[in-house]
Amino acid sequence: MTDKTSLSYKDAGVDIDAGNALVERIKGVSKRTRRPEVLGGLGGFGALCQIPAGYKEPVLVSGTDGVGTKLRLAIDLKKHDTVGIDLVAMCVNDLIVQGAEPLFFLDYYATGKLDVDTAAAVVTGIGAGCEQSGCALVGGETAEMPGMYEGEDYDIAGFCVGVVEKSEIIDGSKVGEGDALIALAASGPHSNGFSLVRKILEVSKADVQQPLGDTTLANALLEPTRIYVKPVLKLIKECEIHALSHITGGGFWENIPRVLPANTQAVIDEQSWQWPAVFSWLQQAGNVTRHEMYRTFNCGVGMIIALPADQLEKALTLLKTEGENAWHIGYITKAADGEEQVIIQ
């Protein structure tokens, strides 16, 4: 009988001790996001959360998303502390479109080799995003999968659940001719269009550390996605909101029609705002057409709100008081059968 080497999980590339060390590092992050409805702490097989008091007919709203290939750029630049904010933003901003208050959030972190410092930086960002949006980070999964990811590359996904009163669901059905449209400024490209961003960087051979306005190209591209939860929830309480559109993948052409009834058209006034410098740089460096820019990027507009025209000034005042850069970007008109639902002029 020959002696055989005793193999362990660590020999196979999975370090359970590193995973446990990460859990200890992030417990405080979760605690800072806690809501009174959450029962128990991290470490259970499932997270328990009550419906907040005061709802008569609560409807749960769920969403999941990732950060896309913005993550590749962040990994290459070793900038791990803000992609977690992006992750939360992409989920919670989708929830508030239907008028839902985010309740709790879970994350999934997958990597070929777990680097505790990197993972802790990412999760700390997730915690910051949860604090900004008022939702609780109740759990997650860290998967170390050797052979599935190159080196210390990683991917992240987020899952969020919110709640809305059934009678107060915002579904776009009330949008009608004469409604005003408000834009909420984006902080940058947010988390969409980064495969095109990376292609432009490759073809142009641009130095990402080059100055761009009062920052650098790298910082402008990696600026975390703006979270609109708190100001928008306040707006919903104070004003009659007919629809909200989160300008993500598909840009203006695809996201605005998602909340418009048939035979209505959004007319966007292109003169009402100036593209932030990063979008002008991308268009020029990549020789990207205007149509493709509006199809791929938010071009400085993170969310569009439809509401009765007589609510416009009240809403703008409230949003600006809440710290948002908001402006009147257009209006709703009738559209004939087969006519485009978005016009940018």
Swiss-Prot record:
Its main location: cytoplasm. Signal peptide: none annotated. It is found in: Cytoplasm. The keyword Nucleotide-binding applies. The keyword Ligase applies. InterPro entries: PurM-like_C_dom (IPR010918), PurM-like_C_sf (IPR036676), PurM-like_N (IPR016188), PurM-like_N_sf (IPR036921), PurM_cligase (IPR004733). GO terms for biological process: 'de novo' IMP biosynthetic process; adenine biosynthetic process. It is an enzyme of class 6 (ligase). Keywords: ATP-binding, Cytoplasm, Ligase, Nucleotide-binding, Purine biosynthesis. Its EC number is 6.3.3.1. GO terms for cellular component: cytosol. Belongs to the AIR synthase family. This is Phosphoribosylformylglycinamidine cyclo-ligase. The gene is purM.
